[in-house]
Protein backbone atom coordinates (compact mmCIF):
# COMPACT_ATOMS: atom_id res chain seq x y z
CA UNK A 1 0.00 0.00 0.00
CA UNK A 2 2.84 2.40 0.77
CA UNK A 3 4.26 1.60 -2.66
CA UNK A 4 0.93 2.67 -4.17
CA UNK A 5 1.20 6.07 -2.51
CA UNK A 6 -0.95 5.43 0.56
CA UNK A 7 -0.01 6.58 4.05
CA UNK A 8 0.36 3.45 6.18
CA UNK A 9 0.79 3.33 9.96
CA UNK A 10 1.63 0.03 11.70
CA UNK A 11 0.99 -0.35 15.44
CA UNK A 12 3.04 -3.13 17.08
CA UNK A 13 3.19 -3.93 20.78
CA UNK A 14 6.82 -5.10 20.70
CA UNK A 15 10.08 -3.69 19.36
CA UNK A 16 11.63 -5.47 16.37
CA UNK A 17 13.26 -7.94 16.21
CA UNK A 18 11.57 -10.47 18.50
CA UNK A 19 10.64 -14.16 18.59
CA UNK A 20 7.14 -15.51 17.96
CA UNK A 21 5.53 -18.93 18.42
CA UNK A 22 5.57 -20.05 14.80
CA UNK A 23 6.68 -23.10 12.83
CA UNK A 24 8.84 -20.83 10.63
CA UNK A 25 8.26 -22.84 7.45
CA UNK A 26 7.03 -20.89 4.41
CA UNK A 27 5.65 -22.59 1.29
CA UNK A 28 7.31 -21.58 -1.97
CA UNK A 29 3.89 -20.46 -3.23
CA UNK A 30 4.73 -17.02 -1.74
CA UNK A 31 7.96 -16.41 -3.68
CA UNK A 32 6.50 -14.64 -6.75
CA UNK A 33 4.61 -12.24 -4.45
CA UNK A 34 7.62 -11.49 -2.26
CA UNK A 35 9.75 -10.87 -5.33
CA UNK A 36 7.18 -8.46 -6.77
CA UNK A 37 7.40 -6.56 -3.48
CA UNK A 38 11.18 -6.46 -3.70
CA UNK A 39 11.31 -8.71 -0.63
CA UNK A 40 13.00 -11.84 -1.97
CA UNK A 41 14.06 -13.77 1.17
CA UNK A 42 17.27 -15.09 -0.43
CA UNK A 43 19.52 -12.59 1.46
CA UNK A 44 18.28 -14.13 4.72
CA UNK A 45 19.96 -17.45 3.81
CA UNK A 46 16.87 -19.56 4.56
CA UNK A 47 16.96 -23.36 4.57
CA UNK A 48 15.54 -24.98 1.43
CA UNK A 49 12.99 -27.66 2.34
CA UNK A 50 11.78 -30.28 -0.12
CA UNK A 51 10.83 -33.37 1.91
CA UNK A 52 8.16 -34.18 4.51
CA UNK A 53 8.39 -36.77 7.27
CA UNK A 54 5.47 -37.85 9.49
CA UNK A 55 5.72 -40.17 12.48
CA UNK A 56 3.05 -41.80 14.63
CA UNK A 57 3.25 -41.68 18.46
CA UNK A 58 4.97 -45.09 18.42
CA UNK A 59 7.48 -43.91 15.83
CA UNK A 60 6.20 -45.38 12.54
CA UNK A 61 7.42 -43.15 9.72
CA UNK A 62 6.00 -41.88 6.45
CA UNK A 63 8.24 -39.94 4.03
CA UNK A 64 6.99 -37.87 1.09
CA UNK A 65 8.39 -35.27 -1.29
CA UNK A 66 6.84 -31.80 -1.12
CA UNK A 67 5.33 -30.72 -4.45
CA UNK A 68 6.23 -27.04 -4.12
CA UNK A 69 8.62 -27.20 -1.21
CA UNK A 70 9.35 -24.24 0.99
CA UNK A 71 11.94 -22.35 2.95
CA UNK A 72 12.74 -22.09 6.64
CA UNK A 73 13.57 -18.76 8.26
CA UNK A 74 13.00 -17.46 11.77
CA UNK A 75 10.36 -14.83 12.38
CA UNK A 76 13.07 -12.95 14.30
CA UNK A 77 15.01 -12.51 11.06
CA UNK A 78 12.13 -12.38 8.55
CA UNK A 79 10.05 -9.82 10.46
CA UNK A 80 13.06 -7.56 10.98
CA UNK A 81 13.81 -7.79 7.23
CA UNK A 82 10.24 -6.81 6.31
CA UNK A 83 10.23 -4.07 8.96
CA UNK A 84 13.35 -2.46 7.50
CA UNK A 85 11.93 -2.69 3.96
CA UNK A 86 8.69 -1.07 5.11
CA UNK A 87 10.57 1.75 6.86
CA UNK A 88 12.56 2.40 3.69
CA UNK A 89 9.30 2.76 1.75
CA UNK A 90 7.80 5.28 4.10
CA UNK A 91 5.65 3.11 6.35
CA UNK A 92 5.26 4.71 9.79
CA UNK A 93 5.56 2.54 12.90
CA UNK A 94 4.13 3.20 16.35
CA UNK A 95 5.97 0.86 18.71
CA UNK A 96 5.99 -0.49 21.25
CA UNK A 97 2.28 0.28 21.55
CA UNK A 98 -0.92 -1.65 22.26
CA UNK A 99 -4.31 -0.98 20.67
CA UNK A 100 -6.97 -0.77 23.38
CA UNK A 101 -10.01 -0.18 21.14
CA UNK A 102 -11.10 0.45 17.56
CA UNK A 103 -14.47 2.07 16.89
CA UNK A 104 -16.14 3.11 13.65
CA UNK A 105 -17.95 6.43 13.23
CA UNK A 106 -20.50 6.07 10.45
CA UNK A 107 -21.07 9.84 10.32
CA UNK A 108 -17.47 10.54 9.30
CA UNK A 109 -16.78 7.13 7.72
CA UNK A 110 -13.64 6.90 9.85
CA UNK A 111 -12.16 4.54 12.44
CA UNK A 112 -10.98 5.82 15.80
CA UNK A 113 -8.02 3.83 17.14
CA UNK A 114 -7.29 4.22 20.86
CA UNK A 115 -3.93 3.13 22.24
CA UNK A 116 -3.39 1.84 25.77
CA UNK A 117 -1.39 4.97 26.64
CA UNK A 118 -4.36 7.18 25.71
CA UNK A 119 -3.23 8.33 22.29
CA UNK A 120 -5.80 8.42 19.47
CA UNK A 121 -5.40 7.88 15.74
CA UNK A 122 -7.99 8.38 12.99
CA UNK A 123 -7.95 6.16 9.91
CA UNK A 124 -10.08 5.62 6.84
CA UNK A 125 -9.31 1.90 6.91
CA UNK A 126 -8.01 -0.48 9.58
CA UNK A 127 -6.52 -3.90 8.83
CA UNK A 128 -6.42 -6.36 11.72
CA UNK A 129 -3.13 -8.22 11.38
CA UNK A 130 -2.60 -8.93 15.07
CA UNK A 131 -2.47 -12.71 15.06
CA UNK A 132 -4.31 -15.54 16.74
CA UNK A 133 -5.86 -13.80 19.73
CA UNK A 134 -5.97 -10.29 21.16
CA UNK A 135 -7.90 -8.19 23.64
CA UNK A 136 -9.26 -6.46 20.54
CA UNK A 137 -11.18 -9.67 19.77
CA UNK A 138 -13.00 -9.23 23.07
CA UNK A 139 -13.78 -5.59 22.30
CA UNK A 140 -15.15 -6.63 18.89
CA UNK A 141 -17.22 -9.36 20.60
CA UNK A 142 -15.93 -12.04 18.24
CA UNK A 143 -17.68 -15.34 19.04
CA UNK A 144 -14.54 -17.49 19.26
CA UNK A 145 -13.08 -15.30 22.03
CA UNK A 146 -15.63 -16.45 24.60
CA UNK A 147 -15.04 -20.12 23.85
CA UNK A 148 -12.24 -21.69 25.88
CA UNK A 149 -9.69 -23.45 23.69
CA UNK A 150 -7.76 -26.46 24.98
CA UNK A 151 -4.61 -25.81 22.94
CA UNK A 152 -1.21 -24.40 23.91
CA UNK A 153 1.82 -23.86 21.69
CA UNK A 154 5.51 -24.13 22.68
CA UNK A 155 8.53 -23.15 20.57
CA UNK A 156 12.32 -23.39 20.83
CA UNK A 157 15.26 -22.89 18.53
CA UNK A 158 17.61 -25.85 18.65
CA UNK A 159 20.98 -26.94 17.33
CA UNK A 160 21.17 -30.64 16.45
CA UNK A 161 24.05 -32.19 14.53
CA UNK A 162 23.04 -34.37 11.62
CA UNK A 163 19.44 -33.20 11.21
CA UNK A 164 18.71 -33.00 7.44
CA UNK A 165 18.20 -29.39 6.39
CA UNK A 166 15.83 -30.27 3.54
CA UNK A 167 13.23 -32.03 5.74
CA UNK A 168 10.25 -30.74 7.68
CA UNK A 169 9.23 -33.43 10.18
CA UNK A 170 5.95 -33.76 12.06
CA UNK A 171 6.06 -36.11 15.04
CA UNK A 172 2.86 -37.12 16.82
CA UNK A 173 2.52 -37.79 20.53
CA UNK A 174 -0.42 -38.25 22.89
CA UNK A 175 -2.76 -35.25 22.46
CA UNK A 176 -0.39 -33.27 20.29
CA UNK A 177 2.26 -33.07 17.60
CA UNK A 178 5.64 -31.40 17.15
CA UNK A 179 7.19 -29.91 14.03
CA UNK A 180 10.91 -29.52 13.44
CA UNK A 181 12.70 -28.02 10.45
CA UNK A 182 15.81 -26.04 9.60
CA UNK A 183 15.94 -22.24 9.55
CA UNK A 184 18.86 -19.90 8.85
CA UNK A 185 22.43 -20.57 10.00
CA UNK A 186 22.70 -23.97 11.70
CA UNK A 187 19.49 -23.64 13.69
CA UNK A 188 16.28 -25.62 13.84
CA UNK A 189 12.79 -24.48 14.76
CA UNK A 190 11.07 -26.91 17.15
CA UNK A 191 7.44 -26.05 17.78
CA UNK A 192 4.66 -28.18 19.23
CA UNK A 193 0.94 -28.02 19.90
CA UNK A 194 -0.68 -29.87 22.77
CA UNK A 195 -3.54 -29.51 25.22
CA UNK A 196 -3.72 -27.54 28.43
CA UNK A 197 -4.72 -30.79 30.21
CA UNK A 198 -1.56 -32.52 28.97
CA UNK A 199 0.56 -29.70 30.37
CA UNK A 200 -1.37 -29.56 33.66
CA UNK A 201 -1.03 -33.31 34.25
CA UNK A 202 2.73 -33.10 33.71
CA UNK A 203 3.15 -29.97 35.80
CA UNK A 204 5.78 -28.25 33.65
CA UNK A 205 7.00 -27.99 30.07
CA UNK A 206 10.13 -29.99 30.94
CA UNK A 207 8.09 -32.79 32.52
CA UNK A 208 5.65 -32.80 29.59
CA UNK A 209 8.52 -33.27 27.17
CA UNK A 210 10.11 -36.02 29.25
CA UNK A 211 6.90 -37.92 30.04
CA UNK A 212 4.74 -37.45 26.93
CA UNK A 213 6.68 -36.18 23.90
CA UNK A 214 9.56 -38.58 24.56
CA UNK A 215 7.25 -41.58 24.17
CA UNK A 216 7.75 -41.00 20.44
CA UNK A 217 11.29 -42.33 19.82
CA UNK A 218 12.03 -39.63 17.22
CA UNK A 219 11.14 -36.90 19.71
CA UNK A 220 13.08 -38.69 22.46
CA UNK A 221 16.19 -38.59 20.25
CA UNK A 222 15.71 -34.87 19.49
CA UNK A 223 15.05 -33.87 23.10
CA UNK A 224 17.99 -35.85 24.48
CA UNK A 225 20.55 -34.66 21.91
CA UNK A 226 19.67 -31.11 20.87
CA UNK A 227 21.20 -27.94 22.26
CA UNK A 228 18.46 -25.49 23.25
CA UNK A 229 19.18 -21.94 22.19
CA UNK A 230 16.59 -20.22 24.44
CA UNK A 231 16.79 -20.02 28.22
CA UNK A 232 13.00 -20.43 28.22
CA UNK A 233 10.61 -21.52 25.46
CA UNK A 234 8.10 -19.19 23.85
CA UNK A 235 4.61 -20.30 24.99
CA UNK A 236 1.11 -19.20 23.93
CA UNK A 237 -2.28 -20.30 25.28
CA UNK A 238 -5.86 -20.37 24.06
CA UNK A 239 -5.06 -21.21 20.43
CA UNK A 240 -8.45 -21.38 18.69
CA UNK A 241 -9.16 -23.04 15.34
CA UNK A 242 -12.82 -22.01 15.41
CA UNK A 243 -14.07 -20.26 12.25
CA UNK A 244 -13.68 -16.47 12.25
CA UNK A 245 -15.11 -13.77 10.00
CA UNK A 246 -12.68 -11.93 7.69
CA UNK A 247 -14.58 -8.66 8.25
CA UNK A 248 -15.60 -7.45 11.73
CA UNK A 249 -17.27 -4.07 12.33
CA UNK A 250 -15.62 -2.68 9.18
CA UNK A 251 -12.14 -4.00 10.11
CA UNK A 252 -10.57 -6.25 7.48
CA UNK A 253 -8.85 -9.18 9.17
CA UNK A 254 -5.68 -10.66 7.66
CA UNK A 255 -3.62 -13.73 8.56
CA UNK A 256 -4.36 -15.58 11.80
CA UNK A 257 -6.77 -12.81 12.86
CA UNK A 258 -9.02 -13.92 9.98
CA UNK A 259 -8.66 -17.65 10.48
CA UNK A 260 -6.03 -19.98 11.90
CA UNK A 261 -5.08 -23.08 9.92
CA UNK A 262 -4.05 -26.04 12.05
CA UNK A 263 -0.25 -26.02 12.40
CA UNK A 264 0.15 -29.58 11.12
CA UNK A 265 -0.75 -28.21 7.67
CA UNK A 266 2.35 -26.01 7.84
CA UNK A 267 0.88 -23.16 5.84
CA UNK A 268 0.00 -20.31 8.19
CA UNK A 269 2.73 -17.92 7.03
CA UNK A 270 1.93 -18.43 3.35
CA UNK A 271 -1.77 -17.84 4.04
CA UNK A 272 -0.99 -14.61 5.88
CA UNK A 273 1.07 -13.34 2.95
CA UNK A 274 -1.61 -14.38 0.47
CA UNK A 275 -4.22 -12.60 2.59
CA UNK A 276 -2.11 -9.46 2.30
CA UNK A 277 -1.95 -9.94 -1.46
CA UNK A 278 -5.77 -10.17 -1.57
CA UNK A 279 -6.49 -7.16 0.62
CA UNK A 280 -3.90 -4.65 -0.65
CA UNK A 281 -5.32 -3.95 -4.14
CA UNK A 282 -8.88 -3.76 -2.80
CA UNK A 283 -7.81 -1.41 0.00
CA UNK A 284 -5.99 0.75 -2.53
CA UNK A 285 -9.13 1.00 -4.68
CA UNK A 286 -11.16 2.01 -1.63
CA UNK A 287 -8.65 4.64 -0.51
CA UNK A 288 -8.61 6.11 -4.03
CA UNK A 289 -12.39 6.45 -3.98
CA UNK A 290 -12.88 3.77 -6.64
CA UNK A 291 -14.70 1.27 -4.40
CA UNK A 292 -17.37 1.95 -1.74
CA UNK A 293 -16.74 0.54 1.74
CA UNK A 294 -19.49 -2.08 1.62
CA UNK A 295 -18.31 -3.26 -1.80
CA UNK A 296 -14.74 -3.47 -0.46
CA UNK A 297 -15.85 -5.57 2.49
CA UNK A 298 -17.98 -7.89 0.36
CA UNK A 299 -15.23 -8.35 -2.23
CA UNK A 300 -12.62 -9.14 0.41
CA UNK A 301 -14.85 -11.56 2.33
CA UNK A 302 -15.73 -13.36 -0.90
CA UNK A 303 -12.10 -13.58 -2.08
CA UNK A 304 -10.96 -14.73 1.36
CA UNK A 305 -13.53 -17.53 1.54
CA UNK A 306 -12.76 -18.67 -2.00
CA UNK A 307 -9.05 -18.80 -1.29
CA UNK A 308 -8.96 -20.14 2.27
CA UNK A 309 -12.33 -21.61 3.29
CA UNK A 310 -11.61 -25.13 2.04
CA UNK A 311 -8.04 -25.12 3.40
CA UNK A 312 -9.25 -24.29 6.90
CA UNK A 313 -12.01 -26.91 6.85
CA UNK A 314 -9.63 -29.61 5.62
CA UNK A 315 -7.06 -28.55 8.21
CA UNK A 316 -9.56 -28.94 11.05
CA UNK A 317 -10.62 -32.35 9.72
CA UNK A 318 -7.03 -33.57 9.35
CA UNK A 319 -6.13 -32.41 12.86
CA UNK A 320 -8.94 -34.60 14.19
CA UNK A 321 -7.08 -37.64 12.83
CA UNK A 322 -4.02 -37.02 14.99
CA UNK A 323 -3.29 -36.83 18.72
CA UNK A 324 -5.20 -39.96 19.75
CA UNK A 325 -2.59 -42.75 19.81
CA UNK A 326 -4.72 -45.49 18.23
CA UNK A 327 -6.17 -43.33 15.44
CA UNK A 328 -2.79 -41.71 14.73
CA UNK A 329 -1.18 -45.14 14.30
CA UNK A 330 -3.94 -46.25 11.94
CA UNK A 331 -3.77 -43.06 9.85
CA UNK A 332 0.02 -43.06 9.49
CA UNK A 333 -0.05 -46.78 8.70
CA UNK A 334 -2.66 -46.26 5.98
CA UNK A 335 -0.95 -43.22 4.45
CA UNK A 336 2.37 -45.10 4.22
CA UNK A 337 0.71 -47.32 1.62
CA UNK A 338 -1.18 -44.50 -0.11
CA UNK A 339 1.31 -41.82 -1.25
CA UNK A 340 -1.28 -40.29 -3.58
CA UNK A 341 -3.46 -39.62 -0.53
CA UNK A 342 -0.64 -37.74 1.17
CA UNK A 343 -0.12 -35.54 -1.90
CA UNK A 344 -3.88 -34.92 -2.17
CA UNK A 345 -4.06 -33.74 1.46
CA UNK A 346 -1.12 -31.39 0.88
CA UNK A 347 -2.80 -29.90 -2.18
CA UNK A 348 -6.00 -29.33 -0.19
CA UNK A 349 -4.16 -27.32 2.48
CA UNK A 350 -1.76 -25.39 0.21
CA UNK A 351 -2.30 -23.04 -2.69
CA UNK A 352 -0.60 -22.32 -6.00
CA UNK A 353 2.14 -19.73 -6.50
CA UNK A 354 0.65 -16.23 -6.52
Protein language model features and the residues they cover:
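C-terminal helical "tail/cap" subdomain of flavin- and related membrane-associated enzymes
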Residues: 281-354
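Short glycine-enriched, charge-decorated loop/helix-capping segments at active-site entrances
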Residues: 67-72, 142-144, 266-270
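Predominantly flavin-linked oxidoreductase catalytic cores and closely associated redox partners
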Residues: 85-222
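FAD/FMN-dependent oxidoreductases across multiple families
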Residues: 120, 200-282
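Glycine-rich FAD pyrophosphate-binding loop
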Residues: 2-22
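Short phosphate-binding/catalytic loops that engage adenosine nucleotides
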Residues: 6, 39, 91
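A conserved beta-strand/loop capping segment in the N-terminal third of enzymes
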Residues: 31-83, 104
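Short, well-ordered alpha-helices that flank and scaffold nucleotide-derived cofactor binding pockets
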Residues: 3, 32, 84, 88, ...
Amino acid sequence: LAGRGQRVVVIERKQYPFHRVCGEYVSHEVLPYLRRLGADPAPLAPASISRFRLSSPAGRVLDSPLDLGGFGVSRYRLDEFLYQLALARGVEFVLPATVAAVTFDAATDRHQVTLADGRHLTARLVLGTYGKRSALDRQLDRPFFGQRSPYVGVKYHLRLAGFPRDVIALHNFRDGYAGISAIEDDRLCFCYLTTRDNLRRSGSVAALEGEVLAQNPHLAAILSSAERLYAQPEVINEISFAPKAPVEQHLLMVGDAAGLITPLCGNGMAMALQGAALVAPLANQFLRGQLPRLALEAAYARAWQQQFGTRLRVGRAVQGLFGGPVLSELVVGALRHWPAGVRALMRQTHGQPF
